[in-house]
Amino acid sequence: MAGLLLLVILGGGWLLWRLRKKTRVLSQKLREAETTFHPLEVDPDAPLTKLLTFLDELAAPKRRTWGVALLQLFGRTRLGDKVIGERAQELSAQLRGAANVYVPNLQQSMADASRATATTDVAAFLISMVQGSVTGQLGSETSLHNPDADLVEPFLSGPENWTAEEVLSAFQPSQGSLQIDLLGNLFVDPFKLESATGGRPLLNVALKAVVDLNLESLVNKGSMGHFMSFVAAMESTYTDVPYHNRVHAADVTARLCALLHRSGIRRHAEARKDRMAIFAALVAAVVHDAGHPGTNNGYHISKRTELAHSFNDQSVLENYSLNLAFTILRQHNFTQNWSTSEFLRFRKTVIAIVLATDFSHHFDHLSKFKAKVGSSQGDAVWDAIETQDHLLLLVMAMKVADLGHCAARLEVHVKWVSRLQEEFFLQGDKEREAYLPVSALMDRHKPGPASGVNQLGFFDVMVLPLLKEWCHAFPETSELLNQAEENRRYWEKDAKEDSDRRHSQGLGKKHSVEVDSLEP
């Protein structure tokens, strides 16, 4: 009896020791999970895109996807039909429940992902970016800009009928003529460009673009001076905020020129005798962030500023930039020799391209592009799309150009991220002063855009899906995707180093923003 009791005691002690050991192991794993970096994993595909992919799988047996594999394995059996039917019902439910079939359900997808990761802030930021914010208090802040007369006057006093080459010669920077390859180089350094042009990067890029893209015929004799005074006036409306300034505008314009050329869009437009589309895209790039005050649409909507009131909370800053552009065009009218139909087409194209830079429409355009282009590449893209969809290609080119700093050379990219972070923090300071909730990634007391984990979330949800679709359709621009992936690896390394540091210090993950609270 005593021996049995001793055996029970020893056995119980051993079990208790094992339990404590397992508890320590589990506690350690929990601490590691809380401090270990996990990428933000979301489903970026819209319901319509999923449906088209499903139909392609059934219609194209050469593509050995799960649907086709099941059909080949089971034939038209009950099991094969059941699995296909269940998938069809799932897609049908997603389509019926979608507010917009072109937009993925980021609210639910990111909320689920962020609960298991250390990426709540970037999830909140991405959701707010595609949904906007509509609550806040009344404020009078606005940002109205008038062109700097001293910067515009030289172009009004020149010869009546000068050409773009003559303007280049007369107004080239003191350091010498602008030596950049706008058509072939996807990686023009905008900061060197700013220095080389004496602080007038946008004016010089726009002028060179007119020459390099062979667009002078659209700016008729007697109107070149008006065009250049228009660009000079637009450049003067860009403020000295850290990111959305004239250097950014020049950067986007230069990259767009290379994209239009390298993709073949320019060549096809010229073949259709449609240089107007290319010219409109150029002007859209020049004006797309004109007058940007360094605060985003959500800020103006939340604070109920005059700008938000003027444009009914719809694409506030994009509409403001367009309003500035067409107001200034009245004073510097390089379209005076155009027909009414030419001007209206130009105006429609510029408006569509600039409005597309509003991130709240990002997934609409991306999903439509995927649906229209499909698996087509290069010249075959033009066979895959209808004439009325050519504008979509210009819109996508502009979106790639606008997000292009993520695919810039690493040194340039990191510099842009630093500038963007400071602009975000300045907005956060304003929000705090106005007793508004500080927007995600805009609190200077927390990790901002220059945090590796936050950059990874942005790359994985916004940047890489866009570039993968674009570069698949236009492989001649695949250098952008390669560079973006290299930049992502930089941020992944940064995120892991930060995770290791936090783990060594015994820090847990911090959720500063609840995604569920972002319902509009």
Segments predicted by a language model, with ranges:
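Single-pass type I membrane protein transmembrane segment
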Residues: 1-8
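Transmembrane-helix exit/juxtamembrane "anchor" motif
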Residues: 10-36, 42
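Divalent metal-dependent phosphate-bond-processing catalytic cores, especially two-metal-ion Mg2+/Mn2+ enzymes
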Residues: 38-46, 50-66, 72-84, 93-108, ...
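Active-site flanking loop/helix segments enriched in acidic
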Residues: 185-194, 229-250, 306-311
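N-terminal charged/capping segments associated with class I S-adenosyl-L-methionine
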Residues: 196, 200-204, 217, 221, ...
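Internal amphipathic alpha-helical repeat/solenoid segments
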Residues: 214-241, 261
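Amphipathic, well-ordered alpha-helical segments in soluble domains
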Residues: 226, 230, 251, 255, ...
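Active-site-adjacent "gating/activation" loops or surface patches in catalytic cores
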Residues: 241-260, 290
